[in-house]
Amino acid sequence: MRERLGGFGVRAARLLARQATTPYRLIKSLSIKPPTRLWIAPPDIRTADSTVADEVRAGYFTYEGKTLHVAAGEAPFARFAPSAGWRRALTGFSWLRHLDETDRPMARRLVDAFLSSPGMRDDPALEPAVVARRLLSFLAQSPLLLDEADPDYYERFMQALAHSARLLWLALGPGKSRGAERLLCAVALVEFAVCADTGGAIAPEAMRLLSRELQRQILADGGHIGRNPQTPLDLLLDLLALRQVFAARGLKTPETMKRVIARTLPMLRMMQHGDGSLALFNGAGATARDRLANVLAHEETRGPAPLQAPATGYQRLDAFPALALVDAGGAPPADFAGDAHAGCLSFEYSRGTERVVVNCGAPGPHNPEAREAARTTAAHSTLTIGETSSARFLEPPRGAGSRLVEGPDKVTVERRAHDNETTLILTHDGYAAAFGLVHARDLTLSHDGRTFSGRDRLLTATDGGATKPADFALRFHLHPQVKATPTAAGVELALGNDERLLFSATGADVQIEESVYYAHPAGARPARQIVLAGKAAAGVDIQWSFTPLPPRLSPSSATVPPEEKL
């Protein structure tokens, strides 16, 4: 097939020339030829949404909280993008999965318009993660896009696949892509190698690249090195589809890939609350519960959820109906700290399907300006000193988003199981250098699931700085559905299912303040938080507990004495 460079091809060729780090990588990338056919169309295990299809048909393209409307028959690619995130989502083409066979002419026309478009300066469409997502989308939706296609369009499409694979090959070179996006690039490159009839030239090395990234990024307990609970979910959505491609082709699934899948599925269950959502730590926001359910349905053997993930740094206390998930880890390596939060020793607490204590979570696309505030220690259910975070954030060049650096150097975890309860004994020294203090936290859950209690102390750091005058604040952020009412005994909490809890504490005054919950699918929601405040000093000792209250009797259920019935 003779290559003809259209708009996308020209942009890809220019980027290839700029990104080649060595002559070998450039020459090797040029060995990736346009396919003449695809052996198989990979499945897409993400859920399709007919309402999104209706919006696309009507010319509405809504992504990352922004909407662009185009006239019937017009393509959106040459229009001014409302934001870089919107452009990434548009040109990643994940939205193709929502369309059906009746949309084939429109889908083909939109893809062809993108391939012919001139693009823009510093186009997000050519970022490695976007190229990888687009390649995966094009491969998965190839029946929709190629069935009954004319030869010229077919050729342009196949050339675009090859151009994308070349860009990914270079993106996986030394010092190019970083963090979790390297995993995405490697998955997409392997999928091309297995699906395209010309992929054999790079298949062995592409699989080695993927295995290397999986070994580097997925830890022994199944968590991701960046500590975001949602990253394994995002990975499995693509990795499970790739496993099915290997099976359909009659190829042996790489051992590293099989081990990673077997590890990450239980890890997802460990980090899952009773309502189906993942815990809000280190960049996790609103959970796409349908996607999580689809992924967990692929787990072949299911035992109890793990209680510990020591490599990733999480702990679980579980006694139905109560569940507590705890951040017991330090800062991830710098290359993977772009989403990390300063939430060491924070916890989330739920009862059945009712969330009680939460972290604020990562904001969605509706509220990107709140991202940095959501990463501070104050946005987590833990203790802060001097209105500062237990870790420091460093703004990198070009304003790409801050990375968490200089988090706690030492985090200790001990788990003690007793006859009637289990206790986590935790410490971190994130405030040692600035204030000469260590935060010690004990969390205890009774085995009948009734009482969840804790103890927070400030200790003198043995190798920290001098103690400085400062205030502390111990925060318990409440889910927006929880109603908090002060009482003489503490704070009464009314849950969404009408269950009531009493929060009580000793060692500090209890206050109720405003909070914000960023992890709602529709955007930030107002919430409340319980705050215990005082002067930070060695010897601070606060004990607190959540205990169920008896249900209120409604007038209709009140018992009437027999003599009053006469």
Task: Report residues per predicted region.
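Residues that flank catalytic or metal-binding motifs in active/ligand-binding sites
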Residues: T91, C185, G313, L345, ...
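Aromatic-lined, polymer-binding surfaces characteristic
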Residues: E74, A81-I261
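Carbohydrate-active enzyme catalytic cores, enriched for enzymes
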Residues: L219-A362, A537
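Extreme N-terminal leader/anchor segments
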Residues: M1-A71
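Short, acidic/polar N-cap/turn motifs at the starts of alpha helices
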Residues: A58, T312-R316, S346, H380, ...
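Short capping micro-motif at the N-terminus of alpha-helices
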Residues: V70, V326-D327, V358-N359, L495, ...
